[in-house]
Amino acid sequence: MMRFSSMLVRNAKLCANVNQMQVAAFSSKAPEMIKIEKVGEKQNVALIKLNRPKALNALCAQLMTELADALEVLDTDKSVGAIVITGSERAFAAGADIKEMTNNEFATTFSGSFLSNWTAVSDVKKPVIAAVNGFALGGGNELAMMCDIIYAGEKARFGQPEINIGTIPGAGGTQRWARAAGKSFAMEVCLTGNHVTAQEAKEHGIVSKIFPADQVVGEAVKLGEKIADQSPLIVQMAKEAVNKAYELTLQEGLHFERRLFHATFATKDRKEGMTAFAEKRKPQWESK
């Protein structure tokens, strides 16, 4: 009951200021390391900006907790149809906070909750778009790859340099690179720590589109607006179906897709979409 009441308070505070959501309180105080606002013509896209400029948005525990809390609230906000995560022009996120991790030991790292809230991005049911400028390295690269779609600036740089400091990626880098770009390229990235240009990342299926640096966020928001204009329920089903391609065999995936396709025929939005198409009008979605 306490958790439910807390969520209500957080939702109310998050939505209090539509144009500039300086989120009031995810815990006991306003977030310090992220900025949030609702953007777009219909204010239906949430823009989260990582805000540790002096540290090139290094992903410390506090930042990741604030991000996880924000995503939890936004995922239940019916006025938000898509979420964009971005950093600065110099860095989306230059990696995890190495100083914070230096003195960690195996026992506490393995048995504790270290990195546990990093799954928040991939757990979100709504589409999440990464708008990447500058460096997206280590944990920053992994954060971008947790998102559903990546738009990148022309000078963006991706990579997993953990090998250079005596460790390996720990938030999905080895797995997501291999699934997206294949074993050979993933091995090169993870075993050398080499940076990957935006164009190389696009060629290997990591990045969807590339834009001039000053257009990346705007284009990501436009994409978010287009997605937010669709049925939220059907968007969620489509996202789930695509993600299953990484977990299931082809036959299992085809079966899963078919079942979800059949399930759309139990929704009001499928009926409305097809009726609106036949009547040559814009559908009015209910997310039911």
Swiss-Prot record:
It comes from the Eukaryota. One of its GO terms (molecular function) is enoyl-CoA hydratase activity. InterPro entries: ClpP/crotonase-like_dom_sf, Enoyl-CoA_hyd/isom_CS, Enoyl-CoA_hydra/iso, Enoyl-CoA_hydra_C. PROSITE patterns: ENOYL_COA_HYDRATASE (PS00166). It is found in: Mitochondrion matrix. One of its GO terms (biological process) is fatty acid beta-oxidation. The record marks E162 as: Important for catalytic activity. It catalyses: a (3S)-3-hydroxyacyl-CoA = a (2E)-enoyl-CoA + H2O; a 4-saturated-(3S)-3-hydroxyacyl-CoA = a (3E)-enoyl-CoA + H2O. Substrate binds at A96, D97, I98, K99, G139. Keywords: Fatty acid metabolism, Lipid metabolism, Lyase, Mitochondrion. Its main location: mitochondrion. Pfam families: ECH_1 (PF00378). It is an enzyme of class 4 (lyase). Its EC number is 4.2.1.17. Pathway: Lipid metabolism; fatty acid beta-oxidation. GO terms for cellular component: mitochondrial matrix; mitochondrion. Homohexamer. Belongs to the enoyl-CoA hydratase/isomerase family. This is Probable enoyl-CoA hydratase, mitochondrial. It comes from Caenorhabditis elegans. The lineage of its organism: Eukaryota, Metazoa, Ecdysozoa, Nematoda, Chromadorea.
